[in-house]
Regions:
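Glycine-rich phosphate-binding active-site loops on the catalytic face of alpha/beta enzymes
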Residues: 71-83, 113-130, 147-149
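Glycine-rich adenosine-cofactor-binding loop
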Residues: 95-99, 110, 128-149
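Conserved N-terminal beta1-alpha1 strand-loop-helix module at the mouth
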Residues: 1-80, 85-112, 140
């Protein structure tokens, strides 16, 4: 499982050329309603040559159809529908949460990793270091603060 993740919203060859293969890429674009499969396949094929893991956000069916490494479920995604799907053994589900309620939802969604954000004061979901540490202790899932083995 990668330890670093980088979010992108489009295919930028120059940016992706400089990505280390220890960093996973998450494709997330809030500006569009429907993902362009051709663009996603372009990114996937490019990253495959670099041996970089590739995830898309909030669309498990498309991630499975395009044989991606996994899916990222954002904090507002509360759907449990994917639990009925038959997933490949190496398919990863990762997610993000801003509070304890969202952490519990991510646990119900069977995420393997939960991003707990935001630590620093740059948006309304700001936690701060102490609250971040406290919330991190409420889950046994891997998170960006503590890893369980």
């Amino acid at each position: 499982m990668p330890k670093k993740y980088h979010f992108i919203s489009s295919f930028d060859r120059d940016l992706l050329n400089n990505i280390d293969n220890k960093i996973a890429i998450i494709y997330r674009n809030h500006q569009i309603k429907k993902y362009d499969s051709i663009e996603i396949l372009k990114i996937k094929n490019f990253l495959k040559t670099k041996k970089v893991k590739f995830f898309i956000s909030n669309n498990i069916k498309l991630a499975m159809k395009l044989d991606l490494d996994g899916v990222y479920l954002s904090s507002f995604n509360k759907s449990l529908a994917h639990l009925a799907f038959s997933l490949k053994k190496k398919f990863m589900i990762i997610g993000s949460a801003h509070n304890l309620k969202q952490i519990r939802i991510k646990e119900l969604q069977n995420t393997q990793l939960i991003f707990i954000s935001s630590i620093f004061k740059k948006n309304k979901n700001y936690l701060g270091i102490n609250k971040f540490k406290l919330i991190s202790n409420y889950t046994k899932k891997n998170n960006c603060f503590r890893r369980n083995k």
